[in-house]
């Protein structure tokens, strides 16, 4: 082992110190899974990424860890890693190998060549009905405006639709009950047309910006007629945490069948550092 450099990025925002935090180790060769998990716990962000050489023809392979476990797929780590790698590589498309397959991210630059936006093609999720009473009880509400369903794109997300943004903002879920649902996240949304508010809860708290949920939310709204297939929505998340985030999402399909999912947003790099592990020279 040796000294391992990392980048800290704020994802789904253009403003430093907002959005969702992410640490990216840009060259994780030599680290085993146990050490990666320990580093993710040490950093304490919702996710930490370790970049490795590709194995399936992509630009790079990535392993994603939250403080407790490895994850096959998560949205804000994919977008943030594409920004971190895209700047030095000067590529228009970054293809990241994840546990859920290869995820391409198309990067957009301004007139000065700086990265300003990225769009990822997400895995098409499977959909199944959820136990509505159990889910609503965990969230602390009595009803959902649309059916409560579970979407699985490598991450497992429940979606509940409330009547107003104020109702979303006022939520105080039962986190042990949320944890017992055994999902990546329980998402509550409200809005209309192209603008929606969202909050995502998991067993130990709340997430500031959830890219793996944004695509399923667009799918959910299109499947149930709240928006048109192919219509892009803008999701605002993280407000109640003091980390406002903006996510763009779009789903293509017909009737209730999903054919493609795209999620986009911006990222800003806010810090760089280095971990020196026990046998690294001081």
Regions found by a protein language model. Name each.
Residues 1-73, 78-282:
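Active-site proximal loop and beta-alpha junction motif in alpha/beta enzyme cores
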